Amino acid sequence: MTEKEEIVRKGYDKIAEKYQADRHLFNNIKELEELESLLPKNAKVLDVGCGAGVPVTKFLVDSGFDVIGVDFSENMLRFARKNVPKAKFIKKDMTKLDFRDNSFDGLTAFYSIIHVPREKHSSLFQSFHRILKPEGVILICVGPDEWEATEEYYGSRMFWSHYSPEKSLQLVKDAGFQILFEKHLVKGREKHYWILARNKK
């Protein structure tokens, strides 16, 4: 794990309680419903950078899906296991997803890719392609503009790393995905760039 990634892990361990208390402000139900409509019944879904499990992991479980959440913050996972007891949670670095090929029907990554050093984004999207089944679907968000910085967030140091939306979209396409929608959305006073895409193998 790089120094920048360690800043993120330690930061979320420190702010876990405050952060999870504000998750209701980030309502992406419409986008999640679009994802839900594209997945088979009883789909197996991976929530990458699941945090405290709300609202994303909970929505997926409530939709009847078999859900695994991964995060490298132990404190976030502690809340996730309490908030969504029907999901399975694993402590794991999202840049080292060692699941078998074609393991999942769907994958979500909300507010997590933005903390991964951008030079790793290409290989990250390629790993999504590998572990998703053919025709599997991803719903992810990335930064709204090109930017990299370490700043204070909820009273703790935090690291962000973004490419431009155009660059991010191209990396997703290059990884083997067909774009279903891409758009800027403001949720909880924050703007992000959202991508829904289908895996092509």
Where are these regions (language model features)?
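A short glycine-rich, Lys/Arg-flanked "PGG" loop and its adjoining helix->strand segment in the class I
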Residues: 122-134
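Conserved class I S-adenosyl-L-methionine
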Residues: 1-40, 146
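Acceptor-substrate binding/catalytic loop of class I
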Residues: 150-166
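Core SAM-dependent methyltransferase catalytic element
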Residues: 184-201
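Conserved beta-strand signature within the Rossmann-like core of class I S-adenosyl-L-methionine
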Residues: 135-142
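A short acidic, Gly/Pro-enriched loop at the edge of an enzyme's catalytic core
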Residues: 95-107
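A short SAM/SAH-binding and catalytic strip from SAM-dependent methyltransferases
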Residues: 106-119
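Class I SAM-dependent methyltransferase SAM/SAH-binding core
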Residues: 46, 52-96
